[in-house]
Swiss-Prot record:
Any single Gene Ontology cellular-component annotation: collagen-containing extracellular matrix
Annotated SMART domains: EGF, EGF_Lam, LamNT
Organism of origin: Mus musculus (Mouse)
Disulphide bridges, residue numbers: C286-C295, C288-C313, C315-C324, C327-C347, C350-C359, C352-C377, C380-C389, C392-C410, C413-C426, C415-C441, C443-C452, C455-C470, C473-C487, C475-C494, C496-C505, C508-C522, C525-C537, C527-C544, C546-C555, C784-C796, C786-C803, C805-C814, C817-C829, C832-C844, C834-C851, C853-C862, C865-C875, C878-C887, C880-C894, C897-C906, C909-C925, C928-C944, C930-C955, C957-C966, C969-C984, C987-C1001, C989-C1008, C1011-C1020, C1023-C1036, C1039-C1059, C1041-C1066, C1068-C1077, C1080-C1093, C1096-C1108, C1098-C1115, C1117-C1126, C1129-C1141, C1144-C1156, C1146-C1163, C1165-C1174, C1177-C1188
PANTHER family for the chain: LAMININ SUBUNIT BETA-2, NETRIN/LAMININ-RELATED
Name of this protein: Laminin subunit beta-2
Tissues where the protein occurs: Neuromuscular synapse and kidney glomerulus.
GO molecular function, one term: structural constituent of synapse-associated extracellular matrix
Amino acid sequence: MEWASGEPGRGRQGQPLPWELRLGLLLSVLAATLAQAPSLDVPGCSRGSCYPATGDLLVGRADRLTASSTCGLHSPQPYCIVSHLQDEKKCFLCDSRRPFSARDNPNSHRIQNVVTSFAPQRRTAWWQSENGVPMVTIQLDLEAEFHFTHLIMTFKTFRPAAMLVERSADFGRTWHVYRYFSYDCGADFPGIPLAPPRRWDDVVCESRYSEIEPSTEGEVIYRVLDPAIPIPDPYSSRIQNLLKITNLRVNLTRLHTLGDNLLDPRREIREKYYYALYELVIRGNCFCYGHASQCAPAPGAPAHAEGMVHGACICKHNTRGLNCEQCQDFYQDLPWHPAEDGHTHACRKCECNGHTHSCHFDMAVYLASGNVSGGVCDGCQHNTAGRHCEFCRPFFYRDPTKDMRDPAVCRPCDCDPMGSQDGGRCDSHDDPVLGLVSGQCRCKEHVVGTRCQQCRDGFFGLSASDPRGCQRCQCNSRGTVPGSSPCDSSSGTCFCKRLVTGHGCDRCLPGHWGLSHDLLGCRPCDCDVGGALDPQCDEATGQCRCRQHMIGRRCEQVQPGYFRPFLDHLTWEAEAAQGQGLEVVERLVTNRETPSWTGPGFVRLREGQEVEFLVTSLPRAMDYDLLLRWEPQVPEQWAELELMVQRPGPVSAHSPCGHVLPKDDRIQGMLHPNTRFLVFPRPVCLEPGISYKLKLKLIGTGGRAQPETSYSGLLIDSLVLQPHVLVLEMFSGGDAAALERRTTFERYRCHEEGLMPSKAPLSETCAPLLISVSALIYNGALPCQCDPQGSLSSECSPHGGQCRCKPGVVGRRCDVCATGYYGFGPAGCQACQCSPDGALSALCEGTSGQCPCRPGAFGLRCDHCQRGQWGFPNCRPCVCNGRADECDTHTGACLGCRDYTGGEHCERCIAGFHGDPRLPYGGQCRPCPCPEGPGSQRHFATSCHRDGYSQQIVCQCREGYTGLRCEACAPGHFGDPSKPGGRCQLCECSGNIDPMDPDACDPHTGQCLRCLHNTEGPHCGYCKPGFHGQAARQSCHRCTCNLLGTDPRRCPSTDLCHCDPSTGQCPCLPHVQGLNCDHCAPNFWNFTSGRGCQPCACHPSRARGPTCNEFTGQCHCHAGFGGRTCSECQELYWGDPGLQCRACDCDPRGIDKPQCHRSTGHCSCRPGVSGVRCDQCARGFSGVFPACHPCHACFGDWDRVVQDLAARTRRLEQWAQELQQTGVLGAFESSFLNMQGKLGMVQAIMSARNASAASTAKLVEATEGLRHEIGKTTERLTQLEAELTAVQDENFNANHALSGLERDGLALNLTLRQLDQHLEILKHSNFLGAYDSIRHAHSQSTEAERRANASTFAVPSPVSNSADTRRRTEVLMGAQKENFNRQHLANQQALGRLSAHAHTLSLTGINELVCGAPGDAPCATSPCGGAGCRDEDGQPRCGGLGCSGAAATADLALGRARHTQAELQRALVEGGGILSRVSETRRQAEEAQQRAQAALDKANASRGQVEQANQELRELIQNVKDFLSQEGADPDSIEMVATRVLDISIPASPEQIQRLASEIAERVRSLADVDTILAHTMGDVRRAEQLLQDAHRARSRAEGERQKAETVQAALEEAQRAQGAAQGAIWGAVVDTQNTEQTLQRVQERMAGAEKSLNSAGERARQLDALLEALKLKRAGNSLAASTAEETAGSAQSRAREAEKQLREQVGDQYQTVRALAERKAEGVLAAQARAEQLRDEARDLLQAAQDKLQRLQELEGTYEENERALEGKAAQLDGLEARMRSVLQAINLQVQIYNTCQ
C-alpha cells in the first residue's frame, strides 16, 4: 500500500531528515550496542556521576507495548486509503488476529510492528487502529525507572489532528503531561499555553506536528529537554524527576478528515480515517541516579535481546537496588544521595570498632553530628555498646591496657550488689572531667567500702532493696537520751527518755503528749474531768476526746451554738403547774430592776391548797436537791410546807434509785422570814425517762401583818431540781485530785449559783468546776435552740444558754413574750401600752394584745371611744344630722358625710350641690345643673346656690367657662363643652393675647389668632421675624443688625433682619463679631467690604503685633518695613526686605500711583503707557511719550487675530512636545478617551433603541449636515467676537473706572453712616468724651472730600476717563453697528434653516418605546403623551393607562411597589394592634386571676369574721330587747330600732332572711308599756307630719325618675356583671326605710343592676349597738314613708321585669351603651363593696357568680340566656322575700298607726 507523496527518508512536508537527527539516531544505536558489551569500569564513576548508554527503550519490550485500538484483532476489517496514484485498488483488508509475517500474515498491523528493526522493506509492517476511532492510547509499561530523553513517531497516515504525551514515574498510579500537540490548540486543549515553551518544564501545546501534510511518513518529535532552553542545574531533583519514567503514554485524541464524514455517516466513509504508525522510537537509558555506568537485565526481562536497554543498574559508590536508590548494608554512615558531576556522593562504611557488621542510618544522629556521621551500629558484640560500639555495656568496664578493638577490652565489674548503685554497676571508663575511674564501684548514699559492702555510721540494715543502701537510725531526737549512740547498729532500736516510748522513741507514754526536747520528753494530757470522755489525748496535739459539743484541747470550753446549763436549769414554773383554785399573779418587769422571779409571775398558794408539778426529761439518774422559790406577802412571813414525790410505779431494786424507801418521798420544810428560797432538807433520787409528780402543799403560814391586811397565802415562783453534785465521781473519787476539787467547790460555795434567778459573775475558781459538773450531768453541752423569731442570733451565752432576745421577748430560748407584751413574731413582741384611763390593767392578752377595757372605752389599748362616739374618755354620740356614722374621736367632726353633705356636722352641701341638709329642715343636697350635675362629664361650676329673689340656681363657673349654666367657653379659652366629655381649655398663647378679646384665639381649635407683643405662631410662642427675645415673657425686641457685618441673605434690609430669636444674635459674616455684627474680630479688618472681615496677616517679626487698622488693614510696622502686612519694603521702595530694598525708579508722568510693584519694582502705569519705568507708549497706542493716543480701530481686530494665532502656535508646540515624549497615543489620549466615551454612548443608544441601519445612516447624515452648518455659524460668530473684542476692552476699562467710583461712593456712604452713628452717640454722651470722635470724624471727612474732588476735578480723573471711554465706545459701536446687524440677520437665517431641518428629524420610534405611542399626534389628543407634552400641572406627561411603553411599565411597577409597601405597613399596624390586644387580654386575664385569688383569700379570712358577726348580732338583739322592754321607750325610739333593723342588708340565703324576719317580728310583738310615754311624743308627731309631706314630694320625684330608670335598662346586664345580678335582686328589695328618696334610689339601682350596694349587716349591727342612745332622736314619720316605699317598690319591680324583657330584645344594639354606663356605675359599686366589708363571707358566693357572668359576657353573648334563667330564679326568690318583708312592714305600720291614733 502506498500513500500519496509518501517517500522514505523524508520528514515533515516531505523534506529529508536533518543530518543532526540522523547522526543522533546512529549514535543511539551505537550506544545500545555498547551497552551489551562486557562490563568495564568506566573511569568517570570514580570522579563523579556516571550514566549508562542511551538506546531505544522499545527494543526487547514489544510485549510491554499496548494500544487501546487495533484493526482486525477479532475479525478481518476492511479499510481504504486516500490516494492520487494510478493504482486501481484503494481498499484493503486488516487481519491482526496473528502476529505479522511478511510471508504468512502481511495484513497483521499489531502495535508491536512499530518497534524499530533493520529488516529490509520494513515499511511493509505498521500499526493501524480501527476505522473512525478518534480516541486511541499507546502505552509503554517499563519494568523499572528509566531516563527518557526524546520520542520519534513516524506515521503512515495523516498525523493526528490532536494528541498528547504523558508520563508516570510511579508505575501508572499518577500521570503528568509532557506536551500537547494539536492542529487547533485553542479548540482541543483550551487554557494550555502555546509553544514555544519559555522554561524547560513548561507544558505547552504545539501545532507544527499536527498539520494535514504530509499525508504519509509525517513525523512527531518530542524532546524532554529543549536544547534551546538553558538549564541552570542539570542534576537538580526537578530535572531528574522530569526525565524519570516508569510508564509512557501517547493519547491520540482527534483524526484528520476531509470533511465528508460530517455529511455522510456511512461506514464506507469512516473506512478512510484511522491512525497508522510505521515506527515509534522512545529514547532513554537505565535510571541509576548517577551511581552506575552499566545496566543488566532486570528480573523477568529477556537477557539476550539485541540492542535492548536493560533496567537493572550495576551499582557503584557502595549503592544497591534496581536503580541504585539505596546504600549497601554496613555503608550507612552518610545519607543516600544521587551522584553529581564532580561528586560521587558514595555511601560510607560505618565505624563499629570491629565489634559488629551491621548498622543503620539515623537522620537525627546525622543532624546532631553536624552532618558528619549518621551511622548507628546494630548488635554490638564483646560486651560493647554505643553508636560506634565504643562503650562497654553496663556492669562492664574498659580495660585501660587494651585497645578498643580488642575483643577482651570490656571486663565485668566487682561490686557488692546490695550496697552499690544500679545493682553493682561500676564506672565504664576513665573521665577526669566527670570524675570517672574505670572499674570503680558507685556506692549508695548510706554505704561505704571498696566494694560498697558496709553501712555508714548512724545507719543500719544493709539491703539491696533500699535505694540508699542502709536505713538511718529512726530515733526521734526529742525522745532520745542525748549524748548516747542513737540506735543499735543491727536492730536499729533507739534509747528513749523516761516519758517516751516506741522503737524510735517517737511516742509518748499513755496519758501524755507533746514530744519535745524537755528532760522528760512529754507532758501530761490534763483532760477536763467532766468535758473529756477519758484522760487520754492525742500524742501530737494533746487534744482530748471531748463529750458532745465540748471543744478546746482539754475539752474545757463549750462549742458555739451550745451552752453549759446552770445548776437551776431544771426549773418548773408554778404558773404552769396544776391545782384547784390556783390564782396566777402576773408581774411586770421595769427596765430599771432585775427580776427576782422567773416566768410571768407567781401562783398564790393559800393554806390547804396544793400545787402539782409534772417533772420529766431528767438528764441522769442521781440525787436532786429540791429548791422552792417564793415571795412573802406580809412582813416576817413564815410557812410550813410538805412536798410529796409521786412515782409512776414501785422502784426497781436494780435501778439506780433502788435504795429509795416510800417514806423518803415525803419531805417537809419550813419557810423562814426574810428568805426567798427553801432547800428541802433531804434530796430525792430520780431517774431519766420517767415522769414524776411533785405535789407541794401549804400546811400553814403566818407573820406580822397590818391590822387592815389579811393573810393571802404564799406567792410560789418555781420549783428547782438541783443535781446533788457532790455525789459525782469527780468529787467522790478517792484520789487526791477529787478531794481537792471537792474542797475547792465547797470552800468557794460554787453550788449557790442555782439558788436565785439572778446570777452573780462566776469566780475564776468556780467556772471550770461548774463546766465540768454540767458536762458530766448532761453528757456535754446542750444546744441553744434559740427561737429564730424571737432571738437576734442563733448563738446563746455559753453559761446558762440565755439567747439574745428581741425587744419584749423573754425566756431562755426567747420564745415567749414578756409580761406586758404581746404578738410574738419576727419583730419580737409589742408592748401592751394599755391606756391608763381606759384599761383595767396594764397587762394585755398575749396573742391579740387586747387590753381589759373599762366601761365605755374601746379599742385594742382601750384608748378611744366606740364607733359613733367621741371625746375619750368621756365618750358621747356624734352629731352628724343623720348623714355620717363616725366622727373625729377628738373634735367630734363628722367623718365620711353621705348624701353629698359636708361640714363639721354634715350640715351643708358639698361643692357642686345645693340645699339645706340639716335635720330640722330635712332638705336634700341636689346637684348643681351647671349645665349637668357633678360626676357627669358636663359639670363646669365650683358651686351654686338658689337665688332668694328669683329662686333660680346661680352657678359659680370654673375658670374658663361662662354662661348662665356655664355652658360656653370664656374668652381666651376653647373647646366644645356641649359634647359629652367636652371641656374648655385655656388657649396656650404664652400670655401674648388679650384675655378679654373673644376673637383672640379660635374657640374650637385654640389656635391663637391675635398675637400681641410682636409674637406669632399657633401659640404666640415665637417672636416675629426680625424680632428676638422671650415670647413667653412678652419681651420680643426688634433685631438691630449692622448691614455691613450681617449676612445679606438673612438681613436684606434694616427693617427685616433675621437674628437669633432667643439671644438676638445677628447672623454675622465670617470673622465679624458683636451681637449686632458691628465690628471685626481681633486681628481682622475690612469690615466695610460687606463680605466679612479679612485677617490682618501681619508679618510675625516685621510688624509690632498681630493687630491692624480696622478699616485699612495696615499693620504697625517696624522701621524699614512697609506694605499692608509689613512684609514688604517701606513706601516708594521695592525688593526683598530680608536682602535689600531699592527705591522705585518710575517716570512720574506715566504712573497712576507712586508706589511700584513691591516684588519686581515694576511701575504701575496709567492707561496707554507701558515700560518698566512707565516711560513708553503702550501697545495699541501711538505718539511720543507722554502724549500717547489710541491706535486706529482696526488695530483691535488684527491684534485679536494675531493673539489667536499665537495661542494656536503655542498649542501646536505643546502637542509636538507630547508627541516626542509619549507618542501619538499619549498626545491625543484625552481625545481618544473622549471619542471612546462618545462611541460607547452611541453604542448604548443604538442597543437601547434597536435602531435599524437605515435610520442610523439617516441620523448620521443629518448630524453631518448639522455639524457643517454649525461650523459655518461658528466662523461667523468668531468674526463677530473679534469685532466686539475692542468694545469689550473699552467697556472693561470703563467698568474698572466705574467700580473705583462705586467703591469711593460706598466708602463715603459708610463714612456718612459712621458719622451718623457718632452723632447719635454724641446726643447721648458728654461733650468731653465725644471730642476725640468729632476730631476723627473731621479728619475722615476732609480726606473723603479730597478724594471726591480728586475723582471729579483732577485731570485726568476717573470721571473724565469714564466720559472719554463712553464716547469712544459709542463711536466704535456706531461704526460696527451695520456690520453687526448684517451678521446678526445672517445668523438668524442660518438658525432658521437648522431649526427647519431639526423639525424633519423624527423621534417617533424612541417615543413609542418609552411612552407607548409614536408621539406624532398632538399632545392634547395623544393618549400616551410624549416628548414635550405636559399635563395640567405642568409636569411632563409620558405613558398612562393602556400605554405599554417603558415609562408606563415603570410607573406600574412603582405603583405596585408602593401598594405593596402600603399593604405591608397596614399589616404591620394591624399586627401591632393585634399584639396590643393580645397583651391587653393577657393583662386582663392576669388581673382577673389576681382578683380571684384575692377574693379567695378574703373569703378564707372572712370565715372567722362570720361567727364573730353572728355573736355580735345575738348580743345586739338582746340589747334591743332590753331597750324596748324598759320603761320610757318612746315611739321614736321604737321606730328607730325597727328602721335600723330593716336597714340591715339581707344575707345571701333565704334561711338567713327568714331567721332575721322572725327576729324582727318578735321584737315588734314584744313592744309593751308604750302608752305611758305617749305624752312625750306630741312634738315628734308634728315633725313626723312634716316628714310625711317630704315623703310625698319624694314620691313625686320618684315618678319623675321613672323615665331615667327606663333609659338605663340597657345597663342591667353589665351592672349585674360588676355587682352580681342575684345580689342586686336580693339587696334591692331590702331598702332603707329611713329615707324615702334613698329607698327609691336603691330600687332604681336594682333596676339598673345594683348601682350601689347596701351597707353590710355586721357594719349596721355595730352602728346600731353604738347608737342606742341616738335612736331616740329619730322620727316616727319614717314609718309612713315605709308604706310609700312598699308601693314604689312594687311598681319598680314591675318596671324591672319590663326592662328585663326589653333588654333581651335590645341587648345586641345597646351593648356599647351598656359598657359606657357600666363604667360610670363602677365607682358606686366599689363604694358599696367598701361599705359591705363585714359581710364579705356571706356575699362571696354571689360575687363569684357575678364574676362568672362577667367573664362569659366578655367571651360571647351566647350565654345570655343562661344568665336570664339565673336572673329569673333570683327574681322568684325576690318575690318571696318581698312578701315576707311586706308582712313585717305591715306589722310595724300597725304598731305605728296605733301610736299615732292615740294622741
